[in-house]
Amino acid sequence: PIFGIHPWRVKNNIELDKFEDYIKKSPLIGEIGLDFHWVEEKYTYSYQIKVFESSYSVQKYNKYINVHTKGCEELILNLIKKYNVSPQTIIHWYSGDKDTLKINRCKCYFTGSVDLGYIKHSKDIIKEIPVNKLLAETDGPTALQWVNGVYGMPDEIKNVYENICTINKLDIEELN
């Protein structure tokens, strides 16, 4: 199993020192990160940062980390640089602005998701990410439902790959 504390689930009474054993055993850490967009309880923001930094502080285990960045992309990218862990970081469904992405060009991986066939901003972001740093994801069946009202199935990943290829003018074989 994969271990992480999603920013939507962060509470002020989390005893972070108790999680190191879980992190040690997990092949990947995530989804962790910050969300200053969907999380309306601003008092949790400092706790989110604390949990996020704690997850990065155990990088002595050299794990890949799946990171949620909604509404605080620049802060996240700066924290990733601070902890010098960008090669192990996967930025989940980046939707920040292109300038932040360019200014904070790092060696992270980024995911493209089910919105690529529908949202121009997402298409523009995907064009900015080097193909060798791009991964595809569906973010679960309800993500597509959020985008177009249709409940997504696992094979939706094929459409994500096709959209990545169309946007970047690539053949599917070039993504291997």
Predicted regions and their residues:
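A metal-dependent hydrolase metal-coordination microenvironment
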Residues: P1-K18
